[in-house]
Amino acid sequence: TVLAKGEVKVSTIEHCMAALYAAGVDNCEIEVNAPEFPILDGSAKPFIEAINSVGVEEQSAEREYYEVTSKKVFTSEDGKSSITILPDTEFSVQAMVNYDSCVLGNQYAILDSMNEFEAEVAGCRTFVFVREIAQLVEAGLIKGGDLTNALVIYDTPADQSQLDKIAELLGQTAPQVSELGYLNGPLQFDNEPARHKLL
């Protein structure tokens, strides 16, 4: 996710924005001195904790709302992702993911109340497939990524020299891998990747 104004762009804002929304913050100023938000632990939890540590101040200005009055569907250019927004009297979010992967296939997550966000969603980490890492690094992305701040999914067999090369791109030491799965499990929830997409 990228925010832009004129020539200025900042990316990977979604963890912070989710935390702000969950905490009820709709007006704040955040200074960033890089083109990418810090990944921290790969979740929204550090942002929630920071907001909780200072609290939220109610302002006298009236809050502006966007009211959903009809179904809206947004689809990515490649057609692989979509978001459907439906009018309702209560807030809820459902996320469904479907990857062509023997490790991460179909998953589903639901959030019926923002009161559940901190305990059920905020700590769910971002994830990446080993087979995509080299391409992401070459594109100048995942600059702060490592085994401590993302679930790393190993779903396509590779020999150790290939894994060593990928790790070198990240400035990391490659783990010794003997089977397909999550390189840095265990998962916090069986559907942690879907919960992260919900975030």
Functional labels for PLM-detected ranges:
Residues T1-L199:
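Short acidic-hydrophobic catalytic motif
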